[in-house]
Amino acid sequence: VKYMVKNTLEPLCKGKTPPEILSLRIADIACGSGIFLEEAYQYLVDFCTEWYKLNDKAHLLVVEEGVEKLPLVDKKAILTNCIYGVDIDIHAVEVSKFSLLLKLIENETEPSVMSSKPILPDLEENIKCGNSLVTDEDVEGLNITMEDLINIRPFDWQEINGGDKFDVIIGNPPYVKTEDIKKLHTNAEVKIYKKYGSSHKQFDKYYLFIEKALDLINENGLMCYIVPNKFLHTESAEKLRLMIKDKIVKLDDFGAVQLFKDKTIYSSILTVGTTNVEKLAYRTVDNVAHLWNDEVEQYSLIPKQGLNCMPWAENSNINDDSPWLVSDDDVYLSMMKKARAKIVSLADIVDIYNGIQTLSLIHI
């Protein structure tokens, strides 16, 4: 989380003054308990603190010898101006607000809060409950019950941040495959999800969150998500790849390294903007500890035009919907290219209707 926040906010904060920082708008549209929002808030507080140390030390409060901190009124301004979140779970929303308020008063003392009343700001306008993927317009004209409407929780984006777009959307969106979407949601809700341009074949719900995030960031904005790396090559992600191909900025690929306990997920950190970039900054991460300690290899800049794709996709590149073979290993890429002429796709031999199905836990 720290790594994602730093990588996303650092270029946006560079060269700004604390008053200019207050114009930044950062959101997590599936915020859960608010972990990403807490970290984003702390990054901005630390940035402003360091700025004042260099430019106006008298603005800071001296806690003890050698320790200075930002006044509570400044921290409140950062929280209420810059940090926004949405989640469909009302309990998660309340936890997120509570966590942010605890973070706000961290290391505060009775004297330090006396000049800032009320001590705790109201975050009702910052952290909202609703379905980030469904708007009121989406459900208009649909024949759905009031119970279904309550469960769907359509969200009006005019109700947050004044309806304006965000500078950064960051987070860890839910991963839900199509068959589970159909089990967990009503037909009406599934129908709405299928209107998304990235909903193709056996799509995953995180595709939709990527698409929605790109719609919600401003012209210079960035989206940074941790998502499974299968979107690089699965057929269901064809439309998503087409959607992000020109605007993908960075990709940290963890390969087989596992980030989540008790779950086998092949993860990546995906950063996408709104403007076209010619080269993809790519690197593999083979040790999570190195990432936290900033000891990972530098990014390889891979030209998007002619970016290596799956070798059995004849004459393919990043400008079509073919699977992407992204690697910074030149030896591996060379081997794959040499094998291209000899590889026969299984799809050229048989008709494939579904992949191998894992055994349901109910039968184990």
Question: Model-predicted segments: where are they?
Answer:
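Surface-exposed beta-strand-to-loop junctions
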Residues: 75-79, 187-190
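Conserved SAM-binding motif I beta-strand of class I
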Residues: 85-86
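Conserved SAM/SAH-binding beta-strand->alpha-helix loop
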Residues: 89
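Short coil/loop residues immediately preceding or within conserved phosphate-binding loops
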Residues: 21-24, 80, 204, 267
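Signature of N6-adenine DNA methyltransferases within the class I
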Residues: 38, 45, 93, 97, ...
